């Protein structure tokens, strides 16, 4: 029996099917997930990420990230220490932060795998276009809760599930590395489960506050 990767309940039901994969929705937390048999191997997953060409010199990409970064900067105190979780091969958030005198460390499973960074505590953690790639979001969110200081902020950017009709035409689901998809209901469930306060920043950006 398949269990939800976020809440571990077995209330999964078919949500969508295409030529590549099937997609299941949890009746408890609302997450839409791809069964493990469709997940890429680590080598194939990294090969997909190796194609990314995002750099700090790409003004379009900086503008894209600024929809998370600028609201975050407005909410943190001077001297705050942050972590960019899943920064990718060309970290940009930390570069943008440094330009404003903010210290951000880079962590990525494939490109900046520095486990010691996950043993420190932070005033904020950013995950921009990351959480949809994570096979075990329950464990990850609990880990991030443990490294966030009290009143710390978790900033997440990921496109949100609206409904089945929109999902069926959604380009976002076609990326083979995207395996978990979040709706507003899902983020509300996460907030209740971890006692985090949820703030909706944009159509694809949410902030959680550890209280």
Predicted features and spans:
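Conserved beta-strand signature within the Rossmann-like core of class I S-adenosyl-L-methionine
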Residues: 151-159
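Short conserved AdoMet
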Residues: 77, 135, 149
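A short SAM/SAH-binding and catalytic strip from SAM-dependent methyltransferases
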Residues: 126-136
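Conserved N-terminal segment of class I S-adenosyl-L-methionine
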Residues: 1-124, 128, 141, 157, ...
